UniProtKB/Swiss-Prot annotation:
Keywords: Cytoplasm, Fatty acid biosynthesis, Fatty acid metabolism, Isomerase, Lipid biosynthesis, Lipid metabolism, Lyase
UniProt source species: Wigglesworthia glossinidia brevipalpis
Keyword 4Fe-4S: no
Name recorded for this polypeptide: 3-hydroxydecanoyl-[acyl-carrier-protein] dehydratase
Family annotation (InterPro entries): FabA, FabA_FabZ, HotDog_dom_sf
Subcellular location as annotated: Cytoplasm
Similarity comment: family membership: Belongs to the thioester dehydratase family. FabA subfamily.
């Protein structure tokens, strides 16, 4: 049984990346450098825009982060796909927090909009994930909308983020059809 906390530290998230937080068969977060979250400051089963679950998480930005040196040389900016991946990471984390088992896989997103950027001079990124639906059948799946704020300004939105937990990833395509 997963012990549900209302917040999680960086060390807790690193435990998740090692497969220690949700147990041997629970989903994992990626390890650094792909872990795009420093802490979860709020996790609830209710709340959010649809009253079906909510996460607020944060990432501290510093100019030495790995992607600034290569994306782009002379014009450093955090790749937008990393912010999108962070939202998928959070949906998968939530499925583990609910007690789901399996390996998490992003299954898509209906719409993503970018209206700002994360620069080396930025200080903090805040993610808001509003759960629309949790499906627990053959496939355990979460559907959510997300917002990304940088230094208090909304810069990305994503509608219908989807993440599923798979017992056997060799059947990934078959299970999703």
């Amino acid at each position: 049984m997963v012990k549900k906390h209302k917040f999680y530290t960086k060390e807790d998230l690193l435990c998740s990346s090692r497969g220690e937080l949700f147990g041997k068969y629970g989903p994992q977060l990626p390890a650094p450098n792909m872990l795009m979250i420093d802490r979860l400051v709020k996790v609830t089963e209710n709340g959010g825009n649809y009253n079906k679950g909510f996460i607020k998480a944060e990432l501290d930005i510093n100019p030495n982060m790995w992607f600034f040196s290569c994306h782009f040389i002379g014009d450093p900016v955090m790749p937008g796909c990393l912010g999108l991946d962070a939202m998928w990471q959070l949906v998968g984390f939530y499925l583990g927090w609910l007690g789901g088992k399996g390996k998490g896989r992003a299954l898509g997103v209906r719409e993503v909009k970018f209206s700002g950027q994360i620069l080396p001079t930025s200080k903090i990124v805040v993610y808001y994930i509003h759960f629309r639906r949790i499906i627990n059948r053959k496939l355990f799946m979460g559907m959510a909308d997300g917002e990304v704020f940088c230094d208090g300004k909304i810069i990305y939105t994503a509608n219908d983020l989807k993440v599923g937990l798979f017992q056997d990833i060799t059947s990934f395509k078959k299970d999703f059809k």
